[in-house]
Amino acid sequence: MLRRILNIAIFGSVSLGFLATFAHAQNAPVWDDELKRYLTAQEMGQEDVYLTPEEAAKLMFPDSDHIRNEVITLSPEQKKLIQERIGWNFPETSFDFFIGETKGKIDGWALIQNTIGKHKPMTYMVGVDPQGEVLNVEVLVYRESRGSEVRKKRFNYQYQGKTPYHPIRINRDIINISGATMSVRSMSAGVKRSLVLVEELFLKPLGKGNAINMANRSDKGFLESLLGF
C-alpha cells in the first residue's frame, strides 16, 4: 500500500511538472529577429479577418453563374505525388475547393490554403483557371503583426498567370516585401501547391494537364524553383 501511495505521489508530481512546463512553453515570449524585441501579447493574439471564403470565391469568379463548394480528400498515392512535385511535405489530407461554373462549363477552381508565415498561419485563397494558370490570390485572415501587405493587389498580382512549371523566386519572379519575407515565401509555396493540386485532381483527369505549358515543363520541386536552380 505504501509503495502504491508513493507511486501515485510521484506520478502526480511528474504530471503537474509536465503541465507547468507545457503551460510555460505556451506562454513563452517569442523573439522577432527583425524587430529585435519580443512580440507583445497583442501582436501574438493579432488576427485580421478580411474576407469570408464565400466572399473570396466570388472575387475569384465574379462572372460565374454558380459557385459550388467541394471538399476533396487525397489518397496516400496522390499526396505522395504532390509532395514530390512541390518538394516539401505537408500535413493536410483534405482541401476545400470552390468551383466556378457558367452554363455547365467550369470557369476555374479556387482552394483555401493555410500556411505558416513567420510565427502563425495565414489563410488565403488561390484561384486557378481552366488553363492551369493563377487567376487571383486573396488573403482571408492574416495573423502576423507585420507583413499584411501580402493582401494588397500591388503584391499578389505578381502570381497571376503562374503555372505549376514556373519558378516563383523571391526578388526575381516575385518582388519581396520588407519585413515579411517568411510570409512571402509561405504564400509562394501555397500558390505552387494550389497549382499542382488543381492539375493533378482536375486537369489531368480531364486530359488537359499534360498539354499545359509543355515548353516550360520541369520535374524540379518547389524549393529548387524558388532558389532558381
Predicted features by range, described:
Residues 1-10:
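Bacterial N-terminal signal peptides that target proteins for export
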Residues 9-20:
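Bacterial N-terminal signal peptides
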Residues 21-25:
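Sec/Tat signal peptide C-region and signal peptidase I cleavage site
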Residues 26-177, 181-185, 189-229:
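Flexible, solvent-exposed loop/hinge segments and secondary-structure transition points
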